[in-house]
């Protein structure tokens, strides 16, 4: 698969990327499963509701059992009552995780990268570095490359690059092992350094 190789001025040449990573067919069902599982595994239980034993209430019987003409009632904490406990309350201990084995996950990443390559959303650079940790420098460099919303995958995250880009809402810098499926499809473009492609091939090939 041929990808764009950009220089510092944004001029493009051709880079021959391995087909084992960037030349696979797109498997929509697999990618959907991998992305949904990734989102589910990142989810933490933050919903809490009270059952009838946890709501604040009195144990006094609201009225006598017989003779009033009303339906019998034992406690105001009953789920049938307004202000009563939930029958099946949500709990912070809920487990939302979904299992995706390594083979499927890697195949999903390969499928995403291949589709991004076909859509011309991947570009390659020799290296990506900055002289100092200045956001202004990072913005100028990305502008010269014609990029705004971009995921930068580099073999080793340079401290200057990390500090300069961490305040940019549409830019993220990661190493190949941290390139997750959600980030790959979230950003408009993916910028990969040559050494990072070698690492991806070693990880996913």
UniProtKB/Swiss-Prot annotation:
Alphabetical list of HAMAP family matching this protein: Ribosomal_uL4_B
Native species: Bordetella petrii (strain ATCC BAA-461 / DSM 12804 / CCUG 43448)
Any one cellular-component term (Gene Ontology): ribosome
The protein's name in its UniProt record: Large ribosomal subunit protein uL4
A molecular function GO annotation: structural constituent of ribosome
Gene Ontology BP term (one): translation
Claim: Nucleotide-binding is one of the keywords in the record: no
Residue ranges of the region described as Disordered: 43-96
UniProt xrefs under Pfam families: Ribosomal_L4 (PF00573)
Family note: Belongs to the universal ribosomal protein uL4 family.
Signal peptide feature range: none
Cited PANTHER family: 50S RIBOSOMAL PROTEIN L4, LARGE RIBOSOMAL SUBUNIT PROTEIN UL4M
Organism taxonomic ancestry: Bacteria, Pseudomonadati, Pseudomonadota, Betaproteobacteria, Burkholderiales
């Amino acid at each position: 698969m041929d990808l764009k190789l950009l220089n510092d001025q944004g001029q493009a040449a051709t880079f021959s990327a391995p087909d084992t990573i960037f030349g696979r067919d797109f498997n929509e069902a697999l990618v959907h499963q991998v992305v949904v599982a990734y989102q589910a595994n990142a989810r933490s239980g933050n919903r809490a509701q009270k059952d009838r034993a946890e709501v604040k209430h009195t144990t006094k019987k609201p009225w006598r059992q017989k003779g009033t003409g009303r339906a019998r009632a034992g406690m105001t904490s009953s789920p049938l009552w307004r202000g009563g406990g939930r029958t099946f309350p949500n709990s912070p201990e809920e487990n939302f995780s979904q299992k995706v084995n390594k083979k499927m996950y890697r195949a999903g990443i390969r499928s995403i990268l291949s589709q991004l390559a076909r859509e011309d959303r991947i570009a390659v650079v020799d290296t990506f570095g900055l002289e100092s940790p200045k956001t202004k420098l990072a913005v100028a460099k990305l502008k010269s490359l014609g990029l705004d919303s971009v995921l930068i995958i580099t073999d080793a995250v340079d401290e200057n690059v990390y500090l300069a880009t961490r305040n940019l809402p549409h830019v993220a810098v990661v190493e190949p092992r941290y390139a997750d499926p959600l980030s790959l499809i979230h950003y408009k473009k993916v910028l990969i350094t040559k050494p990072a492609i070698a690492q991806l091939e070693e990880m996913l090939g």
